A protein has these predicted regions:
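Fe(II)/2-oxoglutarate oxygenase catalytic core
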Residues: 1-154
Length: 154
């Protein structure tokens, strides 16, 4: 049974059970990829806010090793909607964009998180829900900040 840790009235954190080996496998497979690009924001690269590289994946064809994580994300979404009944009073949910895996540079960070679209598509600017998952292999750092809510998540 999923039990989120609530950090704010709308922000919660889920732990994927027995995920360490899977996360290590994904990190190892991506380590030597030639697909890494500097992370960008709408309007272009803003290195002061994103000290990371990223690889983008399409939602309709994820790598097989990502499937357990995406399945867990679906379970989390269902649990979140069950816990927050107001979230159900919205247009239907769907994955309308691909996803990124980020690699932080040194002691880099994701300096902010807000309602924005990395790719600039007008429909994505008004995201209803954002899902962030960490495949962290470090003990310190790697937080993401939600400044509007005053929340830091690791």
């Amino acid at each position: 049974m999923l039990e989120p840790k609530w950090l704010d009235q709308a922000i919660c954190q889920y732990e994927m059970p027995d995920s360490q080996e899977l996360c290590e496998e994904i990190i190892e497979r991506l380590k030597y990829s030639t697909r890494w690009n500097q992370s960008a924001t709408v309007g272009g690269v803003q290195p002061y806010s994103r000290e990371s590289d990223q690889i983008s994946f399409q939602e309709e064809s994820p790598p097989v090793e990502h499937e357990p994580i995406l399945s867990f994300a679906q379970q989390c979404l269902e649990n979140y909607l069950e816990k927050l009944s107001d979230a159900k009073n919205q247009p239907p949910f769907g994955l309308v964009e691909g996803y990124n895996i980020l690699r932080y540079q040194g002691d880099g960070k994701q300096g902010y998180h807000a309602v924005h679209s990395d790719h600039g598509y007008p429909d994505l600017v008004h995201r209803h829900l954002t899902f962030t998952m960490y495949l962290s292999d470090i003990d310190e750092g790697g937080e993401i900040e939600f400044p509007t809510q005053g929340v830091m998540v690791k």
